[in-house]
Amino acid sequence: MAQISKCSSLSTELNESSIISHHHGNLWDDDFIQSLKSSNGAPQYHERAEKLVEEIKNLVVSEMKDCNDDLIRHLQMVDIFECLGIDRHFQNEIQVALDYVYRYWNELEGIGIGSRDSLIKDFNATALGFRALRLHRYNVSSDVLENFKNENGQFFCSSTVEEKEVRCMLTLFRASEISFPGEKVMDEAKAFTTEYLTKVLTGVDVTDVDQSLLREVKYALEFPWHCSLPRWEARNFIEICGQNDSWLKSIMNKRVLELAKLDFNILQCAHHRELQLLSRCWWSQSDIAQQNFYRKRHVEFYFWVVIGTFEPEFSTCRITFAKIATLMTILDDLYDTHGTLEQLKIFTEGVKRWDLSLVDSLPDYIKITFEFFLNTSNELIAEVAKTQERDMSAYIRKTWERYLEAYMQEAEWITAGHVPTFDEYMKNGISSSGMCILNLYSLLLMGQLLPDDVLEQIHSPSKIHELVELTARLVDDSKDFETNKVGGELASGIECYVKDNPECTLEDASNHLNGLLDLTVKELNWEFVRHDSVALCFKKFAFNVARGLRLIYKYRDGFDVSNQEMKTHIFKILIDPLT
């Protein structure tokens, strides 16, 4: 994103030979991508997976019949299916289990263990039930957690570290992450359990706690709900469960783990094919790939979408997302550092008119950029027309126009050395985040008709879309500040806030942005679970795009510097199979 500074480089004449890139190059050579081959996608593995699904369904029926009274067994089944990433195979079983639990849910006291009618309500069962029911959009109130506080207002907790209590605190921590704005008890639960679990990991007296449980605690603290995407969680939990000998004593658990590994590897093979198509047939054959001063991050952007939207039926959506995100990054680089203000005005006008001839007077590298933009956009507009059974080119072009106008505003601020107010910056920065255009193409190519009235509820100016845009802006600015402060540079949102509030330190401004981000997470939770006419797959997509940013920006800007944690993440999800 363009940085607010007194740099006037945009007013200087630029040509291709004078451009210097300050970013590392492409980490994913096409030859390497094309070399990704595995037998895990062979028919026999699909057949084995299908057989395991049927076996597990039969085991579920048998086990649920045997423990029909035990509500926590139903919840544990749902939780393990979801953590291991195989829940899509058992949607009916999950629905039946949660309906059954909800039937006996007490809004004031939660649920008990041992018997569905137990008068003694259980902390762990209630926290587990609350989380599962809320995530599946059942109406449950967080007030139920008040029932598990002592007379001093503290959550029940003994002075010794015991496995049962650690499990209970972990379950409460995970439940507290699915909070809505204004839920004080959820904030209290999160603060309490975070402190407790952190002490557990750093303590010495944990000999009575199973190592697999400690691994779960470590994962939960390092990758909270807002940055624990389905594929990422599945890979990590498969590894954790595979080391839990006591858990694997169960026949059903062995089958579940075998299916989880097979399913992960089968999907990874499908994702290899999509990556190969993206790399060979789109990126490597384009002239833009030879422009070495642009960031080349098509694999990183594919990772962003696949960790949240991984199912086979969304292949076109994933490839589209990676293409548009790559294109947006190239435009970001152009408007940020590689074009003069006059050149950018001409480029923007060319987009408004959708006319390649308007950029004839510009340097070759900008003409190549414009042609790449136009070709990619027109190709995807044609795809959208087929899927949505109507011409949406005018709507899409208008969205591109608004996006580039926001970039132009930033370019003008940079050239003038102007630092806007925080509100001005955020209003423009939300548009320049690119979420509007990025999500639009992807949502339209998810394979389902998206009528205009539903599109309005999931896309601009809907609340959920506004929150995704805000997340993108806040995450980017917060991490820019952390990354750049050592070198004396300021992330633009931080600088604007300090300008408006001279009494604030940079740390104060950073804390303010992080506070806004925490509130945004809670509002996104609410928008995700509330019932409306928007299909859940569309909500999940937008929700997971926002969560994906939190993972990718966890340590640093993972797109700008993708040769560290990001590279490791990509190998773990897209390259290395499970054994």
Curated annotation (Swiss-Prot):
Cofactor binding, per record: Binds 3 Mg(2+) or Mn(2+) ions per subunit.
Positions of Mg(2+) 1 binding: D332, D336
Pathway: Sesquiterpene biosynthesis; Terpene metabolism; oleoresin biosynthesis
UniProt enzyme class: lyase
Annotated residues for binding of Mg(2+) 3: D476, N484
EC number: 4.2.3.80
Stored Gene3D superfamilies: Farnesyl Diphosphate Synthase, Terpene synthase, N-terminal domain
Keywords, comma-separated and alphabetical: Lyase, Magnesium, Metal-binding
Pfam families: Terpene_synth, Terpene_synth_C
GO molecular function, one term: magnesium ion binding
Cofactor(s) annotated in UniProt: Mg(2+); Mn(2+)
Residues that coordinate or bind Mg(2+) 2: D332, D336
Entry annotated with the keyword ATP-binding: no
Reactions mediated catalytically: (2E,6E)-farnesyl diphosphate = alpha-longipinene + diphosphate
Disulfide bonds: none
Motif (DDXXD motif): 332-336
Record's function text: Terpene synthase (TPS) involved in the biosynthesis of sesquiterpene natural products included in conifer oleoresin secretions and volatile emissions; these compounds contribute to biotic and abiotic stress defense against herbivores and pathogens. Catalyzes the conversion of (2E,6E)-farnesyl diphosphate (FPP) to alpha-longipinene.
Family the UniProt entry places it in: Belongs to the terpene synthase family. Tpsd subfamily.
Protein name (record): Alpha-longipinene synthase
Annotated source species: Picea sitchensis (Sitka spruce)
Gene: TPS-Lonp
